[in-house]
Structures are given as C-alpha cells and as structure tokens.
C-alpha cells in the first residue's frame, strides 16, 4: 500500500512522495570488489568512459568514489526539448562486508553505482534521466564495471 504525505504551507499543497520519486537518482548494483579493485580498478574503468575521480571517501561502514561532473553538449534527444547541455556525476558506494576481512587484502565491498544527471534548460540545471545517449552510455558502463568486478574478485 502506498500512501502520500501532504504538507500544507500557505496557499500551496506539496506532495512529498511524488517529488521524492520524481527526483530520485538512479542506483545500480554493479558487483563485489576487493579493496584493491575498489580503489584502483574501478577508476580505470571509469576513465575509459571519460569519468575522472574527484574524491575518495572512506568511512567505518562504506567507501565512496565520486567523479567530477562530465559536461556534454545537448544530444538529439535533448535538442528537441531545448536543453543546451547536461552534466553527469557518478558516485560509487562500496558497502563493507565486515565478515570478509583478510589481513593482506582488506575487505570486500558490495558496490552500487549512483548516477546524477542534470540538464540546463536556459536558466537552471534540472534532474533529467530520459536522455537515450546517457542511458546507453550508463548501460555500457554498468556492463563493463560488472564484468571487471566479476573477473577480478
């Protein structure tokens, strides 16, 4: 059963459930990685798609790889809707499996890819996940990352 949460503020009624679903970034499970594959190998696969790592973040239960924004000119899909350009950033979250600790190899990670894509409409960047060119690129990236992780476990 799905319920919506409504909030009344002055003259406007906001449906938070619909907004949250609409703006939800895309996440994909890409496989299981060793510490070395998470820190080095994933970066090599990302470079093959022209995504450059901007930041690594290690926490007690997970590690993150965050790429720089990749800027692209409007594709045929976006030109028909008058979008000028888009920017895409990837976040790879490696959830640490605490049962997997090995003295020399560190931990194993369950890895998830999150895509953040925004298109410029002339005045603002707005979330957009309907670009065919982007979706094709992300599908290929997911296949390559999953393949790399399955081979190099």
Predicted feature descriptions by range:
Residues 1-12:
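Sec-dependent bacterial lipoprotein signal peptides
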Residues 12-153:
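Ser/Thr-rich, low-complexity intrinsically disordered terminal regions
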């Amino acid at each position: 059963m799905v319920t919506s949460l409504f909030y009344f503020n002055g003259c406007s009624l906001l449906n938070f459930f619909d907004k949250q679903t609409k703006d939800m970034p895309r996440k994909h499970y890409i496989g299981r990685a060793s510490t070395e594959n998470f820190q080095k190998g994933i970066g090599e696969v990302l470079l093959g798609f022209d995504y450059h790592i901007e930041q690594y973040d290690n926490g007690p239960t997970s590690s993150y790889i965050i790429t720089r924004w990749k800027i692209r000119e409007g594709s045929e899909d976006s030109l028909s809707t008058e979008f000028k350009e888009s920017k895409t950033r990837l976040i790879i979250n490696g959830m640490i499996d605490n049962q997997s600790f090995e003295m020399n190899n560190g931990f194993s990670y369950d890895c998830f890819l999150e895509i953040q894509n925004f298109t410029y409409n002339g005045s603002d960047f707005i979330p957009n996940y309907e670009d065919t060119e982007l979706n094709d690129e992300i599908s290929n990236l997911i296949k390559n990352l999953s393949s790399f992780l399955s081979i190099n476990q």
